[in-house]
């Protein structure tokens, strides 16, 4: 009887210990799920270990994953991330774009600059004079493509243009990102387009504007030899991304019945369509989202206003009503006389300093220059170029000053 009681007691003790262990493991798993369940899972790409990561050098940056010396102490979700790719003669254009972003931005802004090696020192010199800006820091990165296929990617459309396709794989610690071309000008705070991330539904991973509003002058619907998104395709010059979702998603495609992740789909797409695409990386993005339309959020044309919206007559209704939010001077219109209205806005911001008085005083001279362009199609509606700009300056600079 005594032996029986000992056995029962031993079993009860073992059972109690097992119960305690089970509860402790459950608590640990719940903690991990809450703290780390949403960490980005990027595709494993071997070339990243050989230079795909940014150097992070330059004034105002302490490298990827570390805060720069001009960075305010903020939670990660408070900081906005902007990326640009600059090659060739794009230094001045890029600096002007960055200036337009900083003039109106409210939240801290971290800029990821991907540039050819010979441009790095020039960027550091130009941006060093902005070190007084408490809400701005940046990182410089080399132009990097996957090893065996680097030559194919470099000659796709324009030099370096396809670098943007690899941003989700290179910037693995960045959750969300706004990519813009160098020929972009912000006429309202970056914060406003950044806020569109909150409008994504559960399936959407990126946002772009339509390539055309009017199908009769559309390029994709008339000439494309590959799939494209929607009625007229999308333009990738302004692209807002939830990169965590992009890295996790398995994409439908027309190459295999299996769904592929971002790091696995790019090269097969290029191999299949490289003889049929005209606009390089933008065409590849159109192909991806043509098969995954539920993943794209489409914002109105005023967020990516181009010469095509006015050279054939005004065809961006939202810009007519509220003004241009983001100006996209593609086709080199900032640097020739074909579209003087676009060039006037670019020159005004290029010559503007980051001092408050300089920003306040740019409107009147700009309006006078725009009035000289009324003989052109885009100049006929010149007021849409300054409608939102006027509001942005008033809201940012005619209110009590805040630390910038």
Curated annotation (Swiss-Prot):
Which Gene3D superfamilies does the record match to this protein?
Spore Coat Polysaccharide Biosynthesis Protein SpsA, Chain A (3.90.550.10)
* Record's protein name: Glucoside xylosyltransferase 1
Xref: Pfam families: Glyco_transf_8
Query: What broad taxonomic lineage does this protein's source fall under?
Result: Eukaryota, Metazoa, Chordata, Craniata, Vertebrata
Q: Where in the cell is it found?
A: Membrane
The residues exposed to the Cytoplasmic compartment are: 1-6
Name the job this protein performs. Answer: Glycosyltransferase which elongates the O-linked glucose attached to EGF-like repeats in the extracellular domain of Notch proteins by catalyzing the addition of xylose.
Instruction: Name the PANTHER family for this protein.
Output: GLUCOSIDE XYLOSYLTRANSFERASE 1, IP22168P
Organism whose genome encodes this protein: Mus musculus (Mouse)
Q: Give the sugar-modified residues.
A: 201
This protein's encoding gene? Gxylt1
């Amino acid at each position: 009887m005594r032996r029986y009681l000992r056995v029962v007691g031993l079993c009860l003790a073992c059972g109690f210990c097992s119960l305690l262990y089970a509860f402790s493991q459950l608590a640990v798993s719940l903690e991990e799920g809450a703290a780390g369940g949403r960490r980005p899972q990027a595709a494993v790409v071997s070339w990243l270990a050989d230079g795909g990561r940014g150097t992070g050098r330059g004034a105002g940056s302490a490298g990827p994953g570390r805060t720069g010396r001009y960075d305010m102490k903020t939670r990660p979700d408070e900081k906005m991330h902007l990326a640009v790719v600059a090659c060739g003669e794009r230094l001045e254009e890029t600096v002007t774009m960055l200036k337009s972003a900083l003039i109106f931005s409210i939240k801290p802004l971290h800029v990821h600059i991907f540039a050819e090696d010979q441009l790095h020192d020039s960027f550091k010199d130009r941006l060093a004079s902005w070190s007084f800006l408490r809400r701005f820091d940046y990182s410089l990165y080399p132009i990097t493509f996957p090893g065996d296929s680097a030559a194919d990617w470099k000659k796709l459309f324009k030099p370096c243009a396809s670098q943007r396709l690899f941003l989700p794989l290179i910037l693995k610690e960045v959750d969300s990102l706004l990519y813009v071309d160098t020929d972009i000008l912000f006429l309202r705070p970056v914060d406003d387009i950044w806020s569109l991330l909150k409008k994504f539904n559960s399936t959407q991973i990126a946002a772009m504007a339509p390539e055309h509003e009017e199908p009769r002058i559309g390029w994709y619907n008339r000439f494309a030899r590959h799939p494209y998104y929607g009625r007229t395709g999308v333009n990738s010059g302004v692209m807002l991304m939830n990169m965590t979702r992009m890295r996790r998603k398995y994409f439908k495609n027309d190459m295999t019945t299996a769904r592929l992740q971002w790091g696995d789909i790019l090269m097969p797409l290029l191999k299949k369509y490289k003889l049929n695409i005209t606009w390089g990386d933008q065409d590849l993005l159109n192909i991806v989202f043509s098969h995954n339309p539920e993943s794209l959020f489409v914002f109105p044309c005023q967020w990516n206003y181009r010469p095509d919206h006015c050279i054939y007559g005004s065809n961006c209704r939202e810009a007519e009503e509220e003004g241009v939010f983001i100006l996209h001077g593609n086709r080199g219109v900032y640097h020739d006389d074909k579209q003087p209205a676009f060039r006037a806005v670019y020159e005004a911001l290029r010559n503007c300093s980051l001092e408050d008085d300089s920003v306040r005083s740019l409107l009147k001279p700009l309006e006078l220059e725009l009035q000289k362009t009324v003989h052109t199609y885009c100049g006929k509606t010149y007021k849409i170029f300054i409608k939102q700009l006027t509001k942005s300056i008033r809201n940012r600079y005619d209110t009590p000053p805040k630390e910038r």
